[in-house]
Regions:
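Bacterial N-terminal signal peptides that target proteins for export
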Residues: 1-7
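Short, glycine-/small- and polar/acidic-enriched structural segments
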Residues: 22-160, 165, 175-181, 196-199, ...
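Pocket-lining segment of extracytoplasmic ligand-binding domains
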Residues: 81-82, 152, 163-254
Length: 339
């Protein structure tokens, strides 16, 4: 546990007492939907809330969740499927916030786009995706509803990253691939691949990346996590109100073209960044995982691993500071509807 202590900085106007920032190691995936982290860092919100955030990029949700479990990260942003599967297997994670709603798509060669809009055409085909992909769960659930066995009627192949999935589709090693933003747009720009289905077509508003941490850390440093969420909530307001600068921040952090970031983030709205915990959506996702036999048999009560109270306290603090702000009022209503 970090011990907050007081240091003194000599300024021109005199001596001012300043508290040392709490260090937090934050893991993320290289996608614009994780951009609230970048805004909170670049606009100084983390610093203003007493958080010294170090950012670490991962290729897959499985790798990221493993790093959280190994106590190499204080916060992880690694989908919904991976954290829930880790919890089912015994990981003591707490979901305390969110980052992303939607954001995945199925990519194919142009000549195959029309037929794959009909799920029955996936029978006998090969579909590539990143290990423990959130889109995988929604896709399998949609297949099952369409009367297709998601384990027997097609072959789903896991790859070590999004680029590998795109390459597999391009080379014909798989018939289709499930990737997250910006990779479906990059695949179109570089190779002429197209989107046949957005995963949100199967389940609108599905939860994607949740904010997770080890439960003992959350309990020991509750106020640190509360202040962390205050910074993310403030970043959400900036993301809503300043699209042009947000695009520049995302593009700089991800080293991608601004036009591509703008298209996915604002023009086409292929995802939404949102720090809300979305407990109802997370429980729906858990039930989908159980329905498609994605989880091992478990007696885990998933409710014990979702803590919405820290976010509630963070949002209350922001509302106290800015009682008339329409975006924060909207976030309050959204929280009440979804938790």
């Amino acid at each position: 546990m970090n011990i907050r202590h007081t240091v003194f900085t000599l300024l021109a106007a005199g001596s001012v007492a300043v508290s040392a920032a709490d260090k937090m190691r934050v893991g993320y995936l290289a996608e614009p939907a994780h951009g609230l982290h970048f805004i909170a860092r670049d606009k100084g919100y983390f610093a203003e809330e007493g958080i010294d955030a170090a950012m670490f990029q991962f290729a897959t949700t499985a790798e990221g969740c493993s790093a959280v479990r190994a106590r190499k990260l204080d916060v992880g942003t690694f989908g919904t499927a991976a954290p829930l599967l880790f919890i089912a297997r015994g990981a003591d994670f707490t979901i305390f916030g969110g980052m992303m709603i939607g954001g995945q798509a199925i990519i194919v060669k142009p000549e195959n786009a029309a037929k794959f809009r009909d799920l029955t055409h996936f029978k006998g085909k090969k579909v590539g995706l990143g290990k423990l992909s959130t889109g995988d769960v929604i896709f399998r659930g949609a297949l099952k509803k369409a009367g297709i066995d998601p384990y027997k009627d097609l072959r789903i192949i896991e790859f070590g990253g999004q680029n590998a999935v795109v390459e597999a589709v391009r080379k014909g090693a798989v018939d289709a691939g499930i990737v997250f933003s910006p990779h479906f747009s990059l695949a179109r720009k570089k190779y002429g691949l197209v989107v046949s289905n957005y995963i949100a077509d199967f389940q609108p508003g599905y939860t994607c990346c949740r904010l997770i941490a080890n439960t003992p850390d959350v309990k020991a440093k509750r106020d640190v996590y509360r202040r962390y969420l205050i910074a993310e909530i403030r970043a959400y307001k900036f993301y809503r109100e300043h699209p042009e600068e947000t695009v520049r921040i995302f593009a700089r952090a991800l080293k991608l073209d601004e036009d591509l970031i703008k298209a996915d983030t604002y023009t086409n709205r292929t995802f939404e960044s949102n720090p809300d915990p979305l407990k109802k959506g997370t429980l729906d996702f858990w039930n989908t995982m159980k329905a498609i036999d994605y989880l091992p048999k478990t007696e885990v009560d998933i409710n014990r691993h979702i803590d919405t109270t820290i976010y509630r306290e963070a949002l209350d603090e922001v509302l106290k500071r800015y009682p008339d702000d329409p975006i924060f009022k909207e976030m309050d209503a959204f929280f009440k509807a979804n938790n």
